[in-house]
Amino acid sequence: MTGKQRREQLIDVGRKLFADKGFEATTVEEISSKAGVSKPVVYEHFGGKEGLYAVVVDREIAALLDGITGALSADLGSRETLERAASALLDYIESSTDGFRILVRDSPAGQSTGSFASLISDVASQVEHILAAEFKRRKLDPRTAPLYAQMLVGMVALTGQWWLDSPKMKKADVAAHLVNLAWNGLANLENKPRLTASR
């Protein structure tokens, strides 16, 4: 096996273990044993478990962002863009279940990038620009676009997590319900929202 092939093998083994057990519960011993190599081989390629985990997470983030960015950059109407973005996330969850499980688990302590929260922030900042333009067109305050972007992306991401853990509904139905809530909620935004219940 070439060095490159060995590296890919270790990434595949690590990805599966991180998805099944999480970062903390996975050991270098386990990774090397499943790959049929000695521990020094893992250290040689990645410097340790943290390095392997970082490569796995970076690949998963790139794959997910690629799908969502493609959906968001298409020159479509707002609803179609929302439908494509929700479908892109659900497609990723369906085709890369292990990858999504890794992304939604907590990152190792002290790691500020490569977490699900940072991924959500990246996607939300892209959505923010789309919403700001739509808000201006509808004479709503574009300064609230970051807030709505976080809410919208969070809703889709958390629903994706729920669907992964209990896939009783078809993917298309989940996407349709997501878009229904998001679109109809966005379609009726108040210019100056207020709470009606007194505190």
Regions found by a protein language model. Name each.
Residues 9, 13, 17-51, 55:
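Helix-turn-helix
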Residues 6-14, 31, 56-60, 64, ...:
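Generic hydrophobic, amphipathic alpha-helix propensity
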Residues 62-65, 112-136, 146-151, 173-176, ...:
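Amphipathic alpha-helical packing segments from all-alpha helical-bundle domains
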Residues 92-114, 128-132, 161-165:
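Amphipathic alpha-helical segments used for helix-helix packing
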Residues 53-60, 103, 119, 123:
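Alpha-helical DNA-contacting segments of helix-turn-helix folds
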Residues 1-5, 142, 190-199:
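N-terminal intrinsically disordered/low-complexity leader segments
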Residues 20-24, 75, 96, 138:
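Short coil/turn segments at alpha/beta junctions that flank glycine-rich nucleotide-binding fingerprints
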Residues 55, 69-95, 149-152, 175:
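Hydrophobic alpha-helical connector segments
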